[in-house]
Amino acid sequence: MLAGLAGSGRALEFGIGTGRIALPLSGRGVPVHGIDLSRAMVARLRAKPGSDAIAVTIGDFATTRVDSSFSVAYLVFNTIMNLTSQDAQVACFGNAARHLEPGGCFVIECRVPELRRLPPGQSVLPWHVSEENWVAYSYDPATQAMHGHYVEFTGDQGEYRTMPFRYVWPSELDLMARLAGMRLRDRWEDWDRTPFTGDSRKHVSVWEKA
């Protein structure tokens, strides 16, 4: 899908990380530029074959500009939720639009908020339990703040860490896109273009710049 949207143009990845998406996309002949705040993640990208063909700028993808225009910009695997305020998420859409050529597309892959799975009267949703780790998510419906809670077990010891997110609804993303001068072109449940329904637990959405 991303290669098709890029066509003969260039692709911009917000949160390029270790290159899980960028490397195969670059391998298909699409020029890719990435933005990421983590130098450690980019170092892991640079250790992989083919990474020399990918340009990377260190910075916050919600605000960092690069001196190029692109046919497609994309942000995958729930990374929009790493921006923990609505203002930052709105800024991300504006930044994507500024980098896109007219007719270019911004693609986001994100989960649908799981609030309906919460037990009545509770704010914590168990997500994964195994002998090696526990994962749970807590939600604040008033602020859309969300925290991931992770426990990793090594022998008799457990290490706990937490990570903040902001969950966001598909319709809210559509409004952010409109504020940035883009309109919804397509929305699917997954990269295979499965139709998006009320039962879908994630979405891949494409907005087009006017």
State where each predicted segment sits:
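A short SAM/SAH-binding and catalytic strip from SAM-dependent methyltransferases
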Residues: 71-87
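Conserved alpha-helix/loop element of class I SAM-dependent methyltransferases that forms part
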Residues: 1-8
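Class I SAM-dependent methyltransferase SAM/SAH-binding core
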Residues: 18-63
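Conserved class I S-adenosyl-L-methionine
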Residues: 8-15
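A short glycine-rich, Lys/Arg-flanked "PGG" loop and its adjoining helix->strand segment in the class I
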Residues: 90-102
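C-terminal lobe and adjacent flexible extensions of AdoMet/dcAdoMet transferase-like proteins
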Residues: 170-210
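SAM-dependent methyltransferase
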Residues: 107-178
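A short acidic, Gly/Pro-enriched loop at the edge of an enzyme's catalytic core
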Residues: 62-72
